A protein has these predicted regions:
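Nucleic-acid-processing active sites and adjacent nucleic-acid-binding tracks
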Residues: 51-81
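Intrinsically disordered, low-complexity and often Lys/Arg-enriched segments
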Residues: 1-30, 52-56, 60, 381-382, ...
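Phosphate-backbone recognition surface of nucleic-acid-processing proteins
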Residues: 246, 250, 256-342, 346
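Gly/Thr-rich phosphate-binding beta-strand-loop-beta motif of the actin/hexokinase/Hsp70
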Residues: 28-49, 131, 165
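Glycine-rich, often acidic, oxyanion-interacting loops/wings at catalytic, nucleic-acid
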Residues: 2, 160-247, 381
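Short alpha-helix plus adjacent loop in nuclease-associated cores
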Residues: 106-144, 198-199, 295-304
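Short, charge-rich amphipathic alpha-helices with coiled-coil/heptad character
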Residues: 138-156
Length: 411
């Protein structure tokens, strides 16, 4: 079906009399193209809006999920019709392909479209129809996303690859420690980077055949991780990254890994957030809510957004909260939360500091001329009160312990 036939079909539907309106042939109408993508084939639905508000499916077809397949199928369609498809593995190259064909693209966020994710009749054809229908009804209902530039996507790919190697190295180290404990041997090395430097002569013979092949692979993993670190550092020197990375690293605890992964995750566009604090929800570092009346449950964080970015920020938070770290407003916030006590107080403190780090970085990137003050006067006073309270609590614990010891001796 060529473009002339498709346009004729749309014109014919528009010119039909409608039971609720007078016959009109000059009314404008909208046409959208919904595409539901799978690895091998994609479903295409062209939908037009008629004068009475009715939506008519004009064309439904299938094409191969390849550049050639899309070029052949979309050569029949008018370039003024927007192409709507979901985020996913193929969305980046598809967006580039459609733009090269001079189509406007709308990349939908399926996680925020209940009519697709929670449909009882979910299939590829219906998904393509729903995308086209929502594009006509209200494009904002598609929750459009802006894809990152290639250089930021490249940085994220480097971080994903590095993160995979780091997790594999950690699994190997834990497995070797488990082998050692099973034969009554304890490995003293505390760092994963130097774990492979263990002396073979000091190891029990029962572990040689099992553990040493893993130890050799650890050395290879370390070399690969260092290679990725160098690639990340090199890419961070590019103009798109350099100024923002230097700006982010003025905050204690933020290194090359934490700064680059956050900048890449937000696509180098800090102004996408109306308020800097919005980045906390974007990265899933805010708690879920379930409140009704007087009941307000304490829930876990949402874990939305990028896992590797969230993990990197939590690791940076651990550095910022170390005892030898300088006193900052961010550190004070974490120490206050940790002082509350309880099983999860320290974890909550890390998450809160991670969120504060992300918010502070975005605020600095939104205004590159703003001066960063690590510790304000209010923060200085806060640390004085914190140390006084900590000393008081320490004395209380010591008094309770002494009282318990006296009671035990008397018994």
């Amino acid at each position: 079906m060529d473009l002339v036939v498709v346009n004729a079909l749309i014109r014919e539907e528009v010119q039909k009399p409608n039971s609720t309106t007078q016959e009109r042939t000059d009314m404008e109408y909208n046409t959208t193209i919904g595409v539901d993508v799978s690895d091998k084939t994609s479903k295409i639905c062209v939908m037009a809006k008629l004068p009475g508000g009715e939506r008519k499916i004009v064309v439904e077809t299938t094409c191969a999920t390849t550049k050639d397949g899309f070029e052949e199928a979309f050569s029949k369609f008018d370039r003024s019709w927007p192409v709507i498809f979901e985020t996913g593995t193929h969305c980046r190259w598809m967006d580039k392909c459609f733009r090269n064909l001079r189509f406007k693209t709308i990349v939908a966020n399926p996680g925020k479209i209940p009519s697709i994710t929670k449909s009882n009749k979910k299939n590829d054809r219906n998904d393509a129809r729903e995308l086209a229908r929502l594009g006509i009804a209200d494009p904002e209902m598609l929750h459009p996303v802006i894809l990152r530039d290639e250089i930021f996507q490249k940085m994220l790919r480097l971080h994903h690859a590095r993160n995979l190697l780091v997790s594999q190295r950690t699994q190997k180290v834990n497995q070797i420690r488990g082998f050692a404990k099973s034969v009554g041997y304890r490995i003293e090395c505390k760092t994963t980077e130097g774990f492979h430097n263990q002396s073979k002569a000091l190891w029990p013979k029962e572990l040689e055949e099992v553990a040493w092949p893993l130890m050799d692979s650890l050395e290879t993993d370390n070399l690969k991780i260092k290679a990725y670190d160098k690639m990340i550092e090199k890419l961070a020197e590019e103009p798109e990254f350099k100024a923002m990375v230097e700006r982010a690293r003025v905050i204690y605890g933020i290194g090359i890994i934490g700064s680059t992964v956050l900048i890449a995750t937000i696509g180098g566009r800090p102004n996408r957030f109306t308020h800097a604090r919005d980045v906390g929800a974007y990265l899933g570092l805010v708690p879920q809510q379930d409140q009704s009346g007087e009941v307000d449950k304490q829930l876990h964080i949402t874990h939305a957004g990028s896992d590797i970015c969230r993990t990197a920020l939590v690791e940076c938070a651990g550095v910022a909260l170390m005892s030898n770290a300088p006193e900052t407003d961010i550190k004070l916030k974490g120490l206050r939360i940790a002082m509350r006590g309880g099983k999860t107080a320290k974890k909550k403190a890390k998450v809160a500091v991670a969120r504060s780090l992300a918010v502070t970085i975005v605020a600095l990137l939104k205004d590159m001329t703003k001066e960063y003050i690590p510790l304000s006067k209010a923060g200085e006073e806060g640390f004085k009160r914190y140390h006084a309270e900590l000393e008081y609590l320490t004395m209380q614990k010591a008094a309770k312990k002494e009282k318990a010891e006296k009671k035990a001796k008397a018994a």
